[in-house]
Amino acid sequence: MTKIKNDKLLISSDFYSVQGEGKSTGVPSYFVRLGMCNLNCGMSQLFTNKLMKEKTLADGEIFKGDLELEGKATWTCDSTSQWLWRGVDRDFQYLIDRWKEQGLYEDIVSGLIHVIWTGGEPTIKQHQEAILNFFRYWYSVDENAKSLIPDLAQRGYWPAAYSEIETNGTVVID
């Protein structure tokens, strides 16, 4: 199992798009897809362990899990890179740099572009700690961002970034 460090995020992918579900449907969003999931949708634990050991699947490969093939499940997870616990441990600065490189930074800081934490399962304990530490880091290193939204900064509302967590709803948040 990959150990998540408190100063890094295990990121499977990150990208800019438009939110396609929930109350923020249609809102420009930056998705941070984290590795690891606590479910084995459509697969037995034995099958999942075999896949993790052999690493026989390519990222994005669509297949049917053993339980789906046996008629014991109606579907199989479509996010292989997430439930196989894949991802790259990224320093917190990685996301800030990506947002700046893509010209999205000011709109993320001001909340015009939402940040969506998804996965995998972002509410797994290690991810909870890493996400909170990311925001602490962001605030500590990027005082200059306050000048982007001076009115909010003067009132103590920085960052004004809007963040959402997409979850499978099976993890209790402490």
Regions found by a protein language model. Give the residues of each.
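N-terminal beta1-alpha1 ligand-phosphate binding loop
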Residues: 12-25, 33-38
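Conserved Radical SAM active-site core
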Residues: 2-4, 9-13, 39, 43-174
